[in-house]
Amino acid sequence: WGHPDLQGNWSNATLTPFERRRGQGPVYTQAEVDQLEGRERSTVQTGSDASDPERGPPPVTGSIGRSYNQIYYDRGDGVARVNGEPRTSLITFPSDGRIPELTPEGARRKREYHDFRSQFGEFDHPELRPLAERCIVFYGSSSASVMGPPMTPTRGYNNNFTIVQDALHVLIMSEMVHDVRIIRLGEPNRLPANVRRWFGDSWGRWEGNTLVVETTNIHPSHGMREQTDKIVHS
C-alpha cells in the first residue's frame, strides 16, 4: 500500500525506562549499561536459585515475596539502542526524555479524580481496585497501559505483540490480557463522544514512514494521567 509493513510478532521487553531521570543525559555510558544489565542478570540468577526446603515459615506480618516464579518474568536483558547508542529513555521528544508537565486544566482534573477516590476505602468495592489487578487493562512502566496510548513495556512479563495490517486498519494484539487495539485509517466517522472504550477510538495517518495515531473517546477509568479526551502519539 506504499507504506511500511508493520506486520509480525514483536517484543518491547527492555531495561530502558519510559521516562528519563531528571538531569540525566540522553545516552548511557558503557559503565552504566554494564551496571544495569549486570544487575538484571544477577536478579534472574537469584530468582532462579532453588529454595531451601528446610526454611521456616515467613513472619506473621511478613511478605512471602514470591507471587510469581522467576521463570514467568521477561523484563528484557538489555537497554534499547538507537543508531547504536544506549538510550536512557524510550521517550525521544521532548529532548529531556520526559512527559511534559500537566496544564492547569490537567492538574485540576487530576486533583478532582483523586479527591473523588479519597472518600472511599481502598477495598470498599471491586471497582476501586486497579485495572491491572482485575486483569482489565494492564499498566506497564508508565501511567499509560501496555496497549496505550502510548504503548509501554510491562517491566514484568507478556511483552509480546502481534500486528496485522491492511490498507485501512492496523490491528495490535497484546500477549498481556490478550487485548486487541484497532487503529482505523481513513474511515469517515468517529465514535459519538459519549461512547468511551478501553484504549479509546484510534485513528491513524501516515506522515512519510511514520504512523501517527490520534486517540479519543478514552474510557474515564483508563486515561493516562487522567487525560481522556485526546492523545496524539506515533
Predicted regions and their residues:
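PEST-like low-complexity, intrinsically disordered acidic/proline/serine-rich tracts
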Residues: W1-S234
